[in-house]
Structure formats: C-alpha cells, structure tokens
Amino acid sequence: MINALRGMKDLLDSDGKLYKFIVETCEQITKNYGYELCETPKMEETSLFKRSVGESSDIVGKEMYQFIDKGGNDVCLRPEGTAGVVRAFIEAKFDKAGGVKRYYYYGSMFRYERPQRGRLREFHQFGVECFGEASVYEDASVILMLNEILDKFGIETTLKINSLGDSECMPKYRQKLISFIDEKKDQLCEDCRRRLVTNPIRVLDCKKEHCQILLKNAPLITENLNEECYSEFEQLKDILTKNGVKFEVDGRLVRGLDYYCKTAFEFVSDEIGSKSAVAGGGRYDRLVDFLGGKSTPAVGWAMGIERIMEILKQKDMPNSRDGIYICALDKKYIDEIYKIGFKLRKNYKVEISYEAKSPNKHLNLADKKFAKLFLCMGEDEAKNGEIWYKNLENKNEKRIKILNLEGEL
C-alpha cells in the first residue's frame, strides 16, 4: 500500500471544507482592503530563495526541497510565498510602472523539517503583499486586516510588534549586539554560533531556552533606532491604539527571514501551544531592489493555514448546511428525480441518490452530508406531480408541485 509521504497530508471531507472556509474568509476580507489574487508557480529557481531568504537562513541551509532538473537547472519547491510574488511583480515590470499594487496568495509551501503539531513538510499559507506604499499607515492596515481575519475565526491572539530599523541604524545595533554576545558565544547553541557569523540579529530568533537566558539582557533594536524609524514606530503604535488593537512591544521579535526592515509583527496564540505564532509579517523595502527590480517599498504577512485549522478543530465548529439532497422511495421514480436534480444543478448544489430507501434512511444520509434541503418522491407525490420538501435547518416541510419547485426553493 502506498501512503502519503511523511509530513504531507490529504485534505478530505471535513478538512477540505475547513481549508476552503479559511481561504474564502481570508479572500473576502483581503479583497475589502483592495487586494487581488496573485498565483505563482510552486517551483522556482533556487537562486531566488538564496537571494531573498538568505543563504544563512535555516530554510536555505537545511530545509529546501532542492534538485537539478533534467535540463540541468537548479530548482526547488517554494519554501515561502513572498519571494515568488516579488519575482512576479518585477517580471511583469510593475516595479517600473509606479503606483501601488496589492496582492494576496495562498497554496502549498515545502520545507524539509521535523513534522509536528501544526507544522508539516508540505504546508499551506495565505499571505498578502503590498508594493509601492511606504506610509506607516499601510503597515497598520495590513496588521488591522490580519487582526480582523483572526477575530472572524474567533481565535484568541496576542499581537507582538517591533521595529528592525533601517540601513542606517541596523549596522550600529548589530555591532552592539555582537559585542554583547562575544563573551558568551561559546555557550550558545550551534545554530546561534553560525548565525553570529552570517546574520547576528537572528541569534535573537533562537527558541532554545538556554540561549534565551544568555541573551536576556541583550541590547534591543528599539533602543537604537534613528529619528525616522523611532517616529514611524511611535506613529504605528498610535494608529493601532486609536483603532482599538491591543499589542505588546517585543524588542526581541525578529522575523525568521533576512529581508525585513522597520515594522515586524507576529500574532501568537496559546490555543496551539504556549505562545505559538499563527501569522506574522512586516516591511521589506529592500527586497525588490535586491532581486533586480527598481527600489520599491513593500509590506506584507503570511498565515499558516494548518495552524488555523488545528485551532478551529478544537473549537468543534458546527458544519453549516448547504445544498439539496434529492431521492426516491421506489426505483421507478429515480428517472424522474434524476431529471429534477439535473435541472436544479444549474443553480444549486445537488446530491442525487440513485437508490430507493425508506424516508428515515434517506433523511439520515442527507443529515450526514449536511444538506440544507431534502426532496423526496414517493407514490403519492408521483401521482400528484409533487415532491416532498423538508428544510433540515428549520424543520419546515411541505409538498410542492414540481412545476413550481424552483420558485418555492
């Protein structure tokens, strides 16, 4: 028997419905903020992620599904969504056109890491990217949008925000951090020692308790911001407060990817483990230029769909009823109900039963399929040109003339 690969799962039945519900909810809200769909390939040149995510990152160093294809091209399955959207933005020459472009995306990402709760080797993300808007109001807007989505799902979260500064204040802070860590570096984990050489600020991203204790009194980037970055961060906090969004300033919050600057944020929840991240993002004004495009400010976020699914499953959310179940009590009426069902499918989701069963058995099947409406034909209904109708939500039932059926529904 052939099974799905480790860390990869099928989306069937209730999982498929939940995935669809999450994506459609996100789409509805992001469209209200002016975002349009951007679909990019699941496979890209490996160099795209080496340049965007950074060769020093764990993603590039350890986790990518990378291979040489039959044409000799170095390719990989995408480990995250932002780089592909940026590549598409540049390839379409939108970076030179000016103006603001807003996109949302969703789909599979791939990382070879240890499978665990809410973390798979093939996982799904929903994300947004805004290009061409440098205002801190846009930073606030993407945070407010994500907060609205998580509220819609009924998930209790804590918003953490930080500023990573810009190309002026970051080098000074990096040197202060290196000086602080230098005498402790031999006590750090192997990953932190590697990061200290390649990208020191990511040492703060370490989740190991031993390293967190050693770095407890490390200098904070928020204490080393220049006037512009400090002013924008204060303005961001003010906008969020005025719009009723609570937050915590976390000076140690650094996004796991190397291209962020200024605003960084993360929504964490205890509903999937102690303060586990369910979504996060920030500003990355340097990435378009870094990937060969015209310098363009950009901000966005990504949300782990599996993590949202895990939380919503715990809430035992009721399945919403949808569609019509149509059936017959005798085989000789199946042709007639098939004809009716086929016609109804032009406007409705319709499940046609090809078997003759008792009314109770049909009702049980309709209930299991979460049908909203139940239509059934027996001898009396057939004689009178009618069909028995029952609404499985409000339990109303009646006989309806077949000629009037669509109008009655």
Swiss-Prot record:
GO terms for molecular function: ATP binding; histidine-tRNA ligase activity. Keywords: Aminoacyl-tRNA synthetase, ATP-binding, Cytoplasm, Ligase, Nucleotide-binding, Protein biosynthesis. It catalyses: tRNA(His) + L-histidine + ATP = L-histidyl-tRNA(His) + AMP + diphosphate + H(+). Gene3D superfamilies: Anticodon-binding domain, Bira Bifunctional Protein, Domain 2. CDD domains: HisRS-like_core. The keyword Ligase applies. It holds the Pfam family tRNA-synt_His. It is an enzyme of class 6 (ligase). The keyword Lyase does not apply. Its EC number is 6.1.1.21. SUPFAM superfamilies: Class II aaRS ABD-related, Class II aaRS and biotin synthetases. GO terms for biological process: histidyl-tRNA aminoacylation. It is found in: Cytoplasm. GO terms for cellular component: cytoplasm. InterPro entries: aa-tRNA-synth_II (IPR006195), aa-tRNA-synth_II/BPL/LPL (IPR045864), Anticodon-bd (IPR004154), Anticodon-bd_dom_sf (IPR036621), His-tRNA-ligase (IPR015807), HisRS-like_core (IPR041715), HisRS/HisZ (IPR004516). Belongs to the class-II aminoacyl-tRNA synthetase family. NCBIfam families: hisS. Homodimer. This is Histidine--tRNA ligase. It comes from Campylobacter fetus subsp. fetus (strain 82-40).
